[in-house]
């Protein structure tokens, strides 16, 4: 991902304020609610029958945190996202058979949740920088599919 020094500083600066448990759970929950076909990958999570059930599901929250912990690892390696996410790309492609479009959808949900969480602090410039990052991560996760 190509970010200017200012974009990188802004992305990392905001990320230091992110509660990965809350933001991760909300982002994954929103993905499962807005794009219900994604729920098929999470059948072992129990009750996903309504928006409330999804958003309050402890397994959704826990997996959302796990996803954002991996995303945070990517932020430390912005110059090598494909290498950073190679094992996860292989897992999601070869074993889980996740449609790679879902990575882009989740990235967009993450940006929405960051905007909701940080309000005016999440400026248009910061949003643009985060869009670059989530697109880069989605591309890295989809790498095995190509």
UniProtKB/Swiss-Prot annotation:
The gene is HBB. This is Hemoglobin subunit beta. It comes from Hippopotamus amphibius (Hippopotamus). It holds the Pfam family Globin. Belongs to the globin family. Keywords: Acetylation, Heme, Iron, Metal-binding, Oxygen transport, Phosphoprotein, S-nitrosylation, Transport. The modification Phosphoserine is found at residue 44. GO terms for cellular component: blood microparticle; haptoglobin-hemoglobin complex; hemoglobin complex. The modification S-nitrosocysteine is found at residue 93. The modification N-acetylvaline is found at residue 1. The modification N6-acetyllysine is found at residues 59, 82. One of its GO terms (molecular function) is oxygen binding. Residues 2-146 form the Globin domain. GO terms for biological process: hydrogen peroxide catabolic process. Red blood cells. PANTHER family: HEMOGLOBIN FAMILY MEMBER (PTHR11442), HEMOGLOBIN SUBUNIT BETA (PTHR11442:SF42). It comes from the Eukaryota. Heme b binds at residues 63, 92. InterPro entries: Globin (IPR000971), Globin-like_sf (IPR009050), Globin/Proto (IPR012292), Hemoglobin_b (IPR002337), Hemoglobin_oxygen_transport (IPR050056). Involved in oxygen transport from the lung to the various peripheral tissues. Heterotetramer of two alpha chains and two beta chains.
């Amino acid at each position: 991902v190509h970010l200017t020094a200012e974009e990188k500083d802004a992305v990392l600066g905001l990320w230091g304020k992110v509660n990965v448990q809350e933001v991760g759970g909300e982002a994954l929950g929103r993905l499962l609610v807005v794009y219900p076909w994604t729920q098929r990958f999470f059948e072992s999570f129990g009750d996903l029958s309504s928006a409330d059930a999804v958003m309050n599901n402890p397994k959704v929250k826990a997996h959302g945190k796990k996803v954002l912990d991996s995303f945070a690892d990517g932020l430390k390696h912005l110059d090598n996202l494909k290498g950073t996410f190679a094992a996860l790309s292989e897992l999601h492609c070869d074993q889980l058979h996740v449609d790679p479009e879902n990575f882009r959808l989740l990235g967009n949900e993450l940006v929405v949740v960051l905007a909701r969480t940080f309000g005016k602090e999440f400026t248009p410039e910061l949003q643009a920088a985060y869009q670059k990052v989530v697109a880069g991560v989605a591309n890295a996760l989809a790498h095995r599919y190509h």
